[in-house]
Design a protein with these regions (language model features):
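Short, cationic-aromatic polyanion-contact patches
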Residues: 16, 40, 76-91
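Beta-hairpin "wing" of winged helix-turn-helix
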Residues: 31-32, 36, 63-73, 79-80
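N-terminal helix-turn-helix
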Residues: 37-69
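A general secondary-structure boundary signal
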Residues: 52, 60-63, 76, 113, ...
Length: 122
């Protein structure tokens, strides 16, 4: 399996937060699977070209949110059901934060639902 591309960091957001979001995206995209080990701190740090302490902080926050279990000497494993939880959370966030902006822009541009739906077939 090929490596996912390195992220482009946003200057105004702490890197550990962006790493958390990266892990969430990779869970949703099923790159990281439930009941499987996450990449080691060193591996993810190397893949993303960041300090291992930054990855450790991101992993600590994910554990605090209840998404992982730590196995001494082995690493972190994603808990069963995490993807469904994250999917619900991301859908809710999209509908509250992103959809109203997108909907407003579609209206402004005169793009109706039929036209929008046709683009999904491309």
């Amino acid at each position: 399996m090929s490596k996912p591309p390195r992220p482009n960091w946003i200057e105004d957001i702490p890197i550990y937060r962006q790493l958390m979001e990266l892990v969430v995206v990779r869970i949703l995209d099923q790159i990281y699977l439930e009941d499987k080990m996450l990449p080691s701190v060193r591996q993810l740090a190397q893949d993303c070209d960041v300090n291992p302490l930054t990855v450790a902080k991101a992993y600590k926050e994910l554990a605090r949110e209840g998404f992982t279990d730590k196995y001494r000497g082995e690493g972190l494993m994603l808990r069963k059901g995490v993807r469904d939880i994250l999917l619900r959370r991301e859908k809710t966030r999209f509908m509250k934060e992103e959809w109203p902006v997108l909907r407003s822009r579609l209206k402004r541009l005169g793009i109706d639902l039929r036209t929008l739906a046709e683009t999904f077939n491309d």
